[in-house]
Regions:
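Extreme N-terminal starter segment of soluble prokaryotic enzymes
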Residues: 1-5
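A general "terminal functional-core" signal
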Residues: 290, 314, 318-320
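Short HxH-centered metal-ligating active-site micro-motif
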Residues: 45-53, 64-68, 532, 540-542
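Flexible beta->alpha loop and helix N-cap segments adjacent to enzyme active/binding sites
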Residues: 10-29, 34-37, 77-92, 101, ...
Length: 584
């Protein structure tokens, strides 16, 4: 029996997972415990959870695998420092960071002083972890593997071929050239300054026109071999000035990546307090188009090289679900897989599985497929009952009724009826989702038929930008009737066109460009959620519900107490906690 603990540590989206004999047992991001979005640091609480879920201690763990290797690309780093004029302060900061990253065993001892780790620590190169996280848990025996992000271990992109349990890394793009840096710089320029705000640009883009694509072709230069370079005149990170990434009290932040030359090219940047104007929307649309041009230039080259019709994706840029949804139309690939945590958190999965295959050697046989995302903490019926009892006075003050329903079908019918009446539902079930998407276990649900549902959700709960779309969860067998595709999308990692004749029926989940970021729901993957959607279909004729994350400007709720708190402080109408139906 071999246990491998995988970590994304010392960086944003800190996370841990546990693999036992090639099977994933548990995986969770640290932010869910610390209650700070994208929490960065050492994931001690995530480690505790993973060990508890398996019923073991740190002493039972044979290997700890971290998704970063300080020694990777060492000579390239040295050559760059000696020739590029990078600032001394930046070099010294990186050296200090290296010391902390190298002391994994020490950090484990400090985080869990009552437990002793006697195994081996493995530092696994960042992009190898991304590639492994995409391929080694995919349903495919052979696939082109692609990782694109900001930076990790001095690379910003990597690719290779996965076959069986083997994985090659055949090419890279190195610092300072990066599609992730380009997109983050444009995100900052448009006035979204926080770590992880890139999804806002993706949502804003369809409201604009691609007026700046030709100008941006001077920023991101494409090569015939599929690679790309940045015109460094428009960026500050190459000398370390804009790359001063920091984590303070768990909150990650980065310096300004774009240079003054970018404002000469595109006009003045937007202040975050300034209202959005058409020119900001045009910049967003152009940035998305520029990213897509580079992304598909790379994919086309890789398809020519490998002559394989399957591609698996990871890295932070794998969250660009709009581009992912165009792969079938704009590239020769015919099959796509992106696991539910494609970014750095998911690197812990890659580190663990790559290490398991390495240490087991020829004995390792791939058998695990990540076909659902439910790998986090759950709550027992007793824990739910205790949490409700502790807030009984608050429920009474809010005029709530509380009923425990032992019949799952009746619970789903009652919830579906409430959705059809325009009510907003907090839905808390089973194990927490792995990755940033709510996928039917920690979700807020609504009626996709209501044109006012977006406004209702933003008014009652989310209080977010009006341009951001809400997503549909749809029964898998109904996809072809509602979307211009018929594919498995279990993790909301692809955006597809909704059929033109159906868009007016589901305005709440139809974006301005006629698309939806769907989640396909199966009875095998999430039977209770499938039963709920089926019940809503029986009432409405529509085999989907609106699904957004169960939170209010915070990490997704993890435990019943957080779900109750969110319900009571917002204007949510119904809270379904396991088998308990709570209504105002």
């Amino acid at each position: 029996m071999t246990y491998v603990l995988g970590l994304n540590a010392y960086h944003a989206d800190a996370a841990a997972c546990l693999v036992k004999d090639g099977d994933l047992i548990a995986a969770v991001e640290e932010e869910r415990f610390r209650r700070i979005k994208h929490w960065g640091g050492f994931p001690s609480e995530s480690i505790r959870y993973c060990l508890a879920e398996a019923g073991i201690s740190l002493g039972d763990v044979d290997h700890v695998a971290v998704n970063s290797d300080n020694s990777a690309n060492r000579w390239r780093k040295l050559a760059y420092v000696l020739t590029s004029g990078v600032s001394l302060a930046y070099v010294l900061k990186r050296l200090r960071d290296r010391g902390d990253r190298a002391d994994v065993a020490g950090n484990l001892k400090r985080a869990l002083p009552e437990q002793e780790f006697r195994g081996t620590v493995h530092a696994v190169e960042h992009h190898l972890c991304h590639l492994a996280s995409a391929f080694l848990v995919s349903p495919y025996d052979k696939a082109v593997t692609v990782s694109v992000d900001g930076f990790g271990d001095f690379s910003s992109a990597a690719w290779g071929l996965g076959e069986g349990g083997k994985l090659t890394v055949d090419g890279r793009v190195y610092f300072p050239h990066s599609l992730g840096v380009f997109y983050e710089a444009m995100t900052q320029f448009i006035g979204f300054p926080h770590y992880g705000d890139e999804y806002k640009v993706m949502g804003l883009a369809p409201y604009g026109e691609p007026r700046h694509v030709e100008r941006m072709a001077e920023i991101v230069k494409l090569k015939n071999d599929g690679t790309f370079t940045l015109n460094l005149r428009y960026f500050r990170h190459a000398a370390g000035d804009g790359a001063n990434y920091t984590v303070k009290d768990g909150i990650p932040s980065g310096g300004r990546l774009w240079s003054d030359a970018l404002s000469e090219l595109l006009g003045a940047p937007r202040d975050p307090a300034q209202p959005l104007e058409d020119r900001h929307r045009d910049i967003a649309r152009s940035a998305q188009a520029t990213y897509e041009n580079a992304f598909f230039n790379l994919l086309d080259a890789l398809h020519r090289r490998y002559a394989c019709d399957t591609v698996v994706l990871a890295g932070g840029c794998a969250y660009n679900s709009v581009a992912n949804g165009k792969i079938f139309d704009r590239s020769p690939f015919k099959k796509v897989y992106v696991q539910s945590a494609g970014g750095d958190a998911g690197g812990s999965i890659g580190a663990a599985f790559a290490t398991w295959h390495k240490v087991e050697g020829d004995k390792a046989r791939r058998h695990f497929v990540m076909d659902h995302a439910y790998w986090g903490p759950s709550a027992t019926p007793d824990e739910i009952a205790t949490a409700i009892a502790a807030r009984r006075a608050d429920f009474d003050a809010a005029g709530c009724t509380i009923e425990r329903m032992g019949d799952e079908a009746a619970l789903c019918r009652r919830t579906a009826q409430a959705i059809s009446e325009g009510k907003v539902i907090g839905w808390f079930q089973g194990r927490l989702e792995w990755g940033p998407r709510a996928l039917g276990n920690r979700s807020i649900l609504g009626d996709p038929r209501r044109s006012d549902m977006k406004d209702i959700l933003n008014l009652k709960i989310k209080r977010r930008e009006s341009f951001r779309p809400f997503a549909p969860s749809i029964l898998r067998e109904a996809v072809k009737d509602w979307f211009e595709t018929d594919d498995d999308v279990p993790f909301m990692m692809q955006v597809f066109k909704i059929r033109a004749e159906k868009r007016q029926e589901i305005p709440a989940v139809t974006h301005v460009d006629g698309t939806g970021r769907l989640q396909t729901v199966t009875w095998a993957g999430n039977p209770r959620y499938a039963r709920l959607i089926e019940a809503f279909r029986d009432i409405s004729g529509v085999p989907m519900v609106l699904n957004t994350s169960f939170n209010e400007n915070e990490p997704v709720v993890c435990i019943p107490e957080e779900a109750i708190d969110c319900f009571l402080r917002t204007k949510m109408d119904v809270l379904v906690l396991g088998d308990t139906f709570i209504a105002r």
